[in-house]
From Swiss-Prot:
<keyword id="KW-0479">Metal-binding</keyword>
<keyword id="KW-0349">Heme</keyword>
<dbReference type="GO" id="GO:0020037">
    <property type="term" value="F:heme binding"/>
</dbReference>
<dbReference type="Pfam" id="PF00067">
    <property type="entry name" value="p450"/>
</dbReference>
<dbReference type="InterPro" id="IPR017972">
    <property type="entry name" value="Cyt_P450_CS"/>
</dbReference>
<keyword id="KW-0472">Membrane</keyword>
<comment type="similarity">
    <text>Belongs to the cytochrome P450 family.</text>
</comment>
<dbReference type="GO" id="GO:0016705">
    <property type="term" value="F:oxidoreductase activity, acting on paired donors, with incorporation or reduction of molecular oxygen"/>
</dbReference>
<feature type="transit peptide" description="Chloroplast">
    <location>
        <begin position="1"/>
        <end position="52"/>
    </location>
</feature>
<dbReference type="GO" id="GO:0004497">
    <property type="term" value="F:monooxygenase activity"/>
</dbReference>
<keyword id="KW-0934">Plastid</keyword>
<dbReference type="InterPro" id="IPR002401">
    <property type="entry name" value="Cyt_P450_E_grp-I"/>
</dbReference>
<keyword id="KW-0408">Iron</keyword>
<dbReference type="InterPro" id="IPR050196">
    <property type="entry name" value="Cytochrome_P450_Monoox"/>
</dbReference>
<dbReference type="InterPro" id="IPR036396">
    <property type="entry name" value="Cyt_P450_sf"/>
</dbReference>
<keyword id="KW-0150">Chloroplast</keyword>
<keyword id="KW-0560">Oxidoreductase</keyword>
Amino acid sequence: MVAAPISTVKLTDANLHTRFHSSSSSTPSTLSLPLSLHFHFSSHSKRFSSIRCQSVNGEKRKQSSRNVFDNASNLLTSLLSGANLGSMPIAEGAVTDLFDRPLFFSLYDWFLEHGSVYKLAFGPKAFVVVSDPIVARHILRENAFSYDKGVLADILEPIMGKGLIPADLETWKQRRRVIAPGFHTSYLEAMVQLFTSCSERTVLKVNELLEGEGRDGQKSVELDLEAEFSNLALEIIGLGVFNYDFGSVTNESPVIKAVYGTLFEAEHRSTFYIPYWKFPLARWIVPRQRKFQDDLKVINTCLDGLIRNAKESRQETDVEKLQQRDYSNLKDASLLRFLVDMRGVDVDDRQLRDDLMTMLIAGHETTAAVLTWAVFLLAQNPDKMKKAQAEVDLVLGMGKPTFELLKKLEYIRLIVVETLRLYPQPPLLIRRSLKPDVLPGGHKGDKDGYTIPAGTDVFISVYNLHRSPYFWDRPNDFEPERFLVQNNNEEVEGWAGFDPSRSPGALYPNEIISDFAFLPFGGGPRKCVGDQFALMESTVALVCCYRISMWN
């Protein structure tokens, strides 16, 4: 270790407690698993440690209320959920079964019961749930432009406008061509320096909090690491994408409060059963919707100012020359600067603001979640924690992470991707068919496949894919080493298996190596454009936790 720990974290199976609940007391979580990881530190020899994942739900509904709601839902299902899709299995259940845990947990149970492709009907809505890499590949890569984002676009459009995630296909194609070149190697090399400086500040802040609490003579200290990692991710997005210092690691500004308010509203909309915010007067009558509009106004005002300032100092240049800049020494190495300076791209301010808002929302949650879960998993596996510490000490010594050194930190990188395998962010990818299609039957499904009409909503369950017993050995175990070896189930017809040599030079395992059994950032043309940014950011932050000894 580089420095002696200020406070020791001791976590064992005996004193480790986990509780998983949905993010809302009344609705299932469909897009993400918001979580809160709490450590209790003690400065005495007897240490008490507990981890709590997510907030605790309120009181359970009375059974009679559940029955009334279920009966109404079942009636709507029978009347409005549409015809059967040939021989496709149908999963039907009580809608209130989803209230006490995230939706994707139930989707996993039904996957084991009904197979890799099944129809799920609840109330007036029906979905096709996919838990098979062959079918996922068919939708995401082979027929990528026969599907759009569907329900997801409906939810996110009021927040992200025409940003990359909710954008229609034509807008997406135009913006992807512009944004993708911005994540070039020189930019990522400079970002590693930024990741390091921001992460070091966060870890030092955590240690100072522990040291300060210890001086007060408290027997235990509760520290919300998820909140600290969220602040870290927000600061990195601000500086790396906008060239704007949110100051989120050290203080809380009105912009930060507005950002978190918007994040909470995005989560709320993704989990609420009835889209009441679409009602004409909701934005003025409903208090949380009024607050949401106020938060959007604060963020948009901030982004408009950043765009205006960037355009005032615009230096128009070809893409090739932009990528050749010395980003390590630029005063402004942000992605916004790259987009504004790109020759021949006269995008209007509104579209640019939508792009930035999308990066702010999407780029913030993944990093905070993966770091929190990584700490959780390492706490349960002290042998792997020691192995990671040994690698950091060997590769870095007294030095700091660099782009080149990241290539040597193999085990740390594998910890990040194994965390994303077990706890993907998001656990579901949502698509809607734009025309009729025939889905492959998938493993143990109908060999003739399943015909679906235009307008069919599809849930690709990343959680199910990542924990499928058909494609992973010991799928529920935390084994970063699994990504180093080939894995091929010959019983699965049409799946090429897991082969690290399939994508030579890749720093991190991806959908190509796994033939779509591993999809933490999606796959195909509409795969997340900032995946390498997020993966490197998480890797560097985890390394800094070891370098500055946030735990033993």
